[in-house]
């Protein structure tokens, strides 16, 4: 009895001792951006510390989730990012600069040593990682960040989950305030095109298809001098993958005009590509706008009525009969489809489709005689030899994507200059007449940006349901929060439960979707971490 009383008294004494805790709070923000497999540093966590009393950050303890494939992780690092400028106080930033550039040629794969000091690195980690810091703190805001590097060969569908278990300041556990959501899954990606690749300043405007052989073909603008639109030195580039997007072959140029007609390359730009696979023949078509001359001014304003290449943009095709390996000389179809009164005719960038009856369809857009843009479609009934256009679907719309939602029924999903949400229209006669879809201008938020839409039939996916799959920046202002959404009712509703945020960061916003196999959707898009980023997502990660 006496022993029990002594033990109880000791327990009460220990409980009365205050927990030793650091005076300063550390704010933690976990990222939701692609983890590029080829990148040496991917930002996993940002740490913001207002050092009012603390002198030293001793260490950070990180826990990796139980389902993480540890054998795929090369290393985890702790970096110190310095201090905050006084004029930035109150902005609650988590970094003074971009530690890893997405736009500076040659500097997109690793942390810029000018902006960070590496304090610790743990290779081949276990489930718990201790990152030693021993970093002297300066009065005011101090920044730290945690980097993740994956091994080559990491699966594109792998995911990493992690949380900060503890951070020690001056030998005491710090109070952590996590400002990001719980349960974030970090998804893998591949930077198909980085700034500076092949001596090009920028890569923009993705299109993506899967051939009958399972080959992925990604097209895009190769913008050599800057990221600006035509007219400029721009070619249409293509990257080809035969392993589901893990690796990509050397870039090809399906369309490039060089110094055609005695004008410099900067006045022979061709771009904003759209690509389709003729599923009946496996022929592949790329369509793009070619601008000849125009004095390096923006083609949107410099293309004029008429048909002559010196005054109006030309609509050109390239064809591949060998699964995207080689490409034909340019085929000019301007005379077939352009009204001479229009200022500018071009495709809807991204992709086209083959209908169930074999008709080839590309989305289009044109600036009419009153200088108002309008979205529509063009189609071919003879395998791409001849093309026709009828009427626009909705006025004051531009970049669109088309999907066959029922046999012979096409849905056109359009960028609308009015802003706020996507415009959607239906045609049953290849664009001769259009009706507004019930979801138009209310179901899909947009900030006036290109988007992607594909239809996947029940027999072609693991869910066994007819799917409409959509991607865009899920916001009405700015371009960020790139998201994949799935509709199970033909696009009438897009449930939040069937959406997956891929990239919260600011980016150019364009994307294109294509099925990799029955279980997996692929997306090529302009992300916050690389100009052309590819990710693979299991359908069951979206429809659970």
From Swiss-Prot:
First and last residue of the signal peptide: 1-22
The family this protein is said to belong to: Belongs to the glycosyl hydrolase 33 family.
Tagged with keyword Ligase: no
Name of this chain's protein: Sialidase
Pfam family, one: BNR_assoc_N
The protein's enzyme class: hydrolase
GO molecular function: exo-alpha-sialidase activity
GO BP annotations listed: ganglioside catabolic process; oligosaccharide catabolic process
Locations listed in the record: Periplasm
Binding, substrate: 415, 479
């Amino acid at each position: 009895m006496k022993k029990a009383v002594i033990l109880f008294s000791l327990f009460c004494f220990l409980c009365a001792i205050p927990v030793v805790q650091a005076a300063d709070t550390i704010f933690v923000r976990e990222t939701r951006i692609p983890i590029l497999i080829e990148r040496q540093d991917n930002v996993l966590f940002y740490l913001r510390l207002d050092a009012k009393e603390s002198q030293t950050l001793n260490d950070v303890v990180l826990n990796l989730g139980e389902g993480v494939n540890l054998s795929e992780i090369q290393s985890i690092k702790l970096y110190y990012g310095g201090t905050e400028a006084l004029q930035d106080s109150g902005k609650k930033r988590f970094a003074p600069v971009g530690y890893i550039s997405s736009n500076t040629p040659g500097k997109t794969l690793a942390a810029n040593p000018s902006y960070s000091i590496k304090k610790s690195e743990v290779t081949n980690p276990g489930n718990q990682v201790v990152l030693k810091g021993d970093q002297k703190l300066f009065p005011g805001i101090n920044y730290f960040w945690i980097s993740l590097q994956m091994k080559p060969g990491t699966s594109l569908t792998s995911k990493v989950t992690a949380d900060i278990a503890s951070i020690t300041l001056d030998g005491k556990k710090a109070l952590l305030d996590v400002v990001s959501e719980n349960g974030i899954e970090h998804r893998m990606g591949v930077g198909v095109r980085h700034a500076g690749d092949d001596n090009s300043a920028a890569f923009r405007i993705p299109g993506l298809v899967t051939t009958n052989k399972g080959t992925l073909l990604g097209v895009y603008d190769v913008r050599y001098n800057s990221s600006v639109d035509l007219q400029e030195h721009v070619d249409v580039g293509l990257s080809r993958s035969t392993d589901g997007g893990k690796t990509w072959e050397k870039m090809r140029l399906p369309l490039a005009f060089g110094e055609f007609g005695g004008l410099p390359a900067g006045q022979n730009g061709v771009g904003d590509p759209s690509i389709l696979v003729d599923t009946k023949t496996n022929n592949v078509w790329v369509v793009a706008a070619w601008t000849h001359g125009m004095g390096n001014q923006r083609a949107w304003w410099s293309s004029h009525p008429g048909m002559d290449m010196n005054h109006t943009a030309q609509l050109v095709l390239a064809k591949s009969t060998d699964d995207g390996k080689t490409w034909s000389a340019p085929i000019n179809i301007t005379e077939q489809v352009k009204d001479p009164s229009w200022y500018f005719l071009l495709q809807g960038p991204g992709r086209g489709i083959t209908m169930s009856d074999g008709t080839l369809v590309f989305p289009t857009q044109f600036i009419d005689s009153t200088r108002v843009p309008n979205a529509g479609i063009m189609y071919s009934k003879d395998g791409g030899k001849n093309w026709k256009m009828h009427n626009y679907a909705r006025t004051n719309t531009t970049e669109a994507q088309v999907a066959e939602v029922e046999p012979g029924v096409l849905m056109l999903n359009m960028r609308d200059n009015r802003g706020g949400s996507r415009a959607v229209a239906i045609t049953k006669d290849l664009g001769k007449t259009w009706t507004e879809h019930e979801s138009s201008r209310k179901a899909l938020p947009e900030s006036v940006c290109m988007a992607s839409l594909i239809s996947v039939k029940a027999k072609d996916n693991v869910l066994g349901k007819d799917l409409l799959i959509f991607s865009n920046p899920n916001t009405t202002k700015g371009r960020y929060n790139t998201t994949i959404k799935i509709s199970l009712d033909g696009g009438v509703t897009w449930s939040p439960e069937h959406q997956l945020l891929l990239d919260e960061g600011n980016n150019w916003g364009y994307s294109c979707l294509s099925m990799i196999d029955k279980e997996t959707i692929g997306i090529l898009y302009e992300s916050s971490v690389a100009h052309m980023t590819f990710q693979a997502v299991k359908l069951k990660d979206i429809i659970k």
